[in-house]
Every structure is written in C-alpha cells, then in structure tokens.
C-alpha cells in the first residue's frame, strides 16, 4: 500500500473511493436501465428487435475492446487524468443519448458511455489495490461490490417507474446531474496514486486484442439473436479465436507485452478468475431468463417483473460490504465454498419452476441465489488480486475485467440457446400450438437453461475446494 500520492501529499482513501462509487453507480445504472425501454424504442424509431439489441451488443463490444488495453492506459496516464476522462466520456455519452432524435445518435451515445465505463472499472480496481493494505482490501472491494451489484439491480425497476410516467430520454436526463456531481467531487478529492511508466506501445498487440476479444464478445452477443449457424457468428468466432491465439503467443514471446500473462503463474489469481467467470455467467444468464419467465409465464408487466427481481439485487449489493469484512477476518474459504453451496441449492429449485409457480417463490429463490453469488464474487476476486505483486496490478485488473465481459456474453448466449432448444423440443411433442402451449414451452426451455446454470455452479463448487488465502 502507498502512503503518499505521487505529488507527495498523504493519500486519503475514503474520498478517493467515494469518487469512484458515485461515478461507478451512475455508469452501471445507465448500463442496465435502458433494457426496460427497448420495446418502447422499437416503436419510437420504427426498428426491429434485432436492431435495438445493438444498444446492448454495442455497449458490450466497446467494453470487450477497451478493457483489455486498460492495463496499458493505467501505466501511461495518471489516476486523476483517467478518472476525469472516464467520467467526461460518461457525461458526453449520456447527454448525446438524452438528446438523440434518431437511433443512430442514440447508438453513438451508448458507445461513448461504454468508453467511460471501460476506463473507469479497471482504474477503480487498480486504485483500490494501491491505496488499501491487504488486510483492508476485502472491505474496500465490498464497497465496490455494493455499487457493481446494486446499480444494475435497481436500474430496471427505476427505469420502469420512469417509463410509466415520462419518456425514455429521462433515463439519461436523471443520470446526468449525478455524473456532473461525481466529476466535481473527483476534481477536489481524486489523487494520483499510480506510477506512470509509459511502456512501449505495441500496435500489433492492440490490433490482435481488438479483433480477438471484440470478435468473441460480438459472436456470443449475436448468437442468441442470429443463431449459431449464422455466417456472421461463425466468422466472428473464427476470426476472434485466431486473433486471440496470436495475441497470446505474442504476449508470451515479447519482453514487454501489452498484457502480462505472468499473472497466470499465481494459482490463486487463476482460480479466482475461474470462480468470477462462473459467477458472472450465472448472474447474466439469470438476468436474461427470469424477466422472460416473469413477463411471459407469469404474465407480469415489465415494472412488476422488475419489482420481483429487486429484493435479490438489493440483497446482493448490501451483502457485498458485509462479505468484504468477513473476508478480511476469515479469508476466502469461509465464504466462497458456502456461497457456491447456496447457489447450487437455489439453482436446483429454479430448474423445477413451472407455469404456476408463484412470484413469491421466485423472489425467495432469486434472493437466495444472489446471496450465494455475493459470497463468491468479491472474495474470490480480491483473493486472486492479492497474490499479485504491485507491478502486475494493472494487468491483473485488466484481465479480470475483460473476462467478466466475455463470461457475461457467453453466459447469455448459451442460456438463450439452451432455452430456445428446449422450447423447440417441447413444441414438437405438444398437442396444438395455442397460447398455453407457447407459455409451457418457454417455461420448459427456461428450466433447461437453469440446468446449465446448475452445472456451472457445481463446477464452481468443486473448484472452490482448492481456494486458499493468498499470500
């Protein structure tokens, strides 16, 4: 841990983390809040459902391209400079989106927003590692977890309330003043805590990273809509896979790589990465499946569906600071292993939901699942990063955040694919094709998709048995 900022003044960790919490909360709120407005946007701009999905795909694609090179940016620019740049991009993107008269301009606004998020998240994790000692990082990461989990949880509910009373533009207008406050707060309290080394920039590595991670994220993000047999998806996977292979080979053979893969020599980092990867797949697939189930099988309105999922999301966020303190006191094993056990139990019962399952049952099962995931996510991530030497913090945070985006895209695509296959199989044996059969087929498909989540949770539980407190 550093005691002084690069200018010589004493580091004040609390105001620094508060700056990140404000900016991060609004950034991540905006990321998910727009999901509730997609059906409205189809009518407003007279576009197809495939086109409107680009608001999500484009956002994920921008993250997938920029987050991998964030390790380089962290070594080239100061903490204050990157923070102001990130929040400025978020403000500009939000303003463009709020004023958008066309879908194309809204799309540009979303991409600009994503640039801000892609810069902010790795910077936030890297700064926490630098300003907090190891025995306090769990609590600090828990506060970050509160934002990362809580903002996406309340986003759909708040946006649903906005959409019932105002137009979709107000999702962005309401976010704008809070981002400006975060920028002003950061101008006063943000300090330079990182060391600017300005390593050599390898253009070929950046190109390979962009093609590799961008291609993979795009392929999986598009697969749910276009299908795995789509030429676009197949070409993206092939190009992305080849580029990733060449990227890894180049990083291993370079003296000063863009992304230092030596982080994988540290076993707790690698294990933590696997556990976070699995957890994110479970979260993102659940965020896709349960709204579909609630709105179709239980015939709830979008706002009501958001309310059903709100308790679990809020619990997940509120648990993060608590699990962070427990991590500091007892280490990762006391949290991660029980967390996966809780997740396995919740997912087992989610595989058995039916058309007549009550909303209360879904609230309970979703809340239990979110509690389990909160016991896994931040402890596994913090423990993994703790094992790295400070010089590898930028690379470790970049890799951790990159694979979260990749895992989210994969989890969503696989869940939708399994659900669609389950629907099709059910309809082939169903008597008739009326509304009741359609609802029953969707429910059967969602059951199958939750089996995938259950299998991932079981794999996570087995892997968690090997976790040890990093030294």
Swiss-Prot record:
GO terms for cellular component: membrane; plasma membrane. GO terms for biological process: response to antibiotic. The keyword Transmembrane helix applies. It is found in: Cell membrane. Pfam families: MFS_1 (PF07690). Keywords: Antibiotic resistance, Cell membrane, Membrane, Transmembrane, Transmembrane helix, Transport. The chain crosses the membrane at residues 13-35, 55-77, 84-106, 111-133, 140-162, 167-189, 201-223, 227-249, 269-291, 329-351, 358-380, 445-467. Its main location: membrane. Gene3D superfamilies: MFS general substrate transporter like domains, Multidrug resistance protein D. It is a multi-pass membrane protein. It comes from the Bacteria. One of its GO terms (molecular function) is transmembrane transporter activity. The keyword Transmembrane applies. PANTHER family: LINCOMYCIN RESISTANCE PROTEIN LMRB, MAJOR FACILITATOR SUPERFAMILY MULTIDRUG TRANSPORTER MFSC. Belongs to the major facilitator superfamily. EmrB family. Proton-dependent transporter. May mediate the efflux of lincomycin. This is Lincomycin resistance protein LmrB.
